[in-house]
Amino acid sequence: MDEEKRPKPLPPSLRGRRRYIAYQVISEDKFIFQDLINSIWHSLLNLLGELGASQADIWIVKDTYDEKKQIGIIRCSHNNVEQVRTALALIERIGDVRVVVKVLGISGSIKATQMKFFEETKLTEFTKTL
């Protein structure tokens, strides 16, 4: 595409405000990530309906899901954070596995969410400087 025909990106003042929700899945057994996505969408659609789910602007960030710790991030609109938290709390099963989805916290950027809720404290950060 030519540079002249490309649409201009929206300025930050016109973009939607987003929040990133860190969640942890506590389960009795292992499950497939795609089943988790299906359960989240099923819960959102049951609680909010199609119109509410589209207004919530949900995006499940696949690259940030840690299968070992079962921690992930969901992006949503700043107006719908509480509805998304409620939908996550209503998830009881992923496939045939009984689960509890715990919200770890909310942040305004993916980087801050990862630093707060994913990173383990490293002992090298506490070295004494003289």
Regions found by a protein language model. Give the residues of each.
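Beta-strand cores of modular interaction/reader domains in eukaryotic scaffold and signaling proteins
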Residues: 22-24, 73-75, 102
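Short proline/glycine- and acidic-rich turn/helix-capping motifs at secondary-structure junctions
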Residues: 96-117
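A common structural junction motif
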Residues: 44, 90-99
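Surface-exposed, low-hydrophobicity interaction/linker segments
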Residues: 24-64, 113
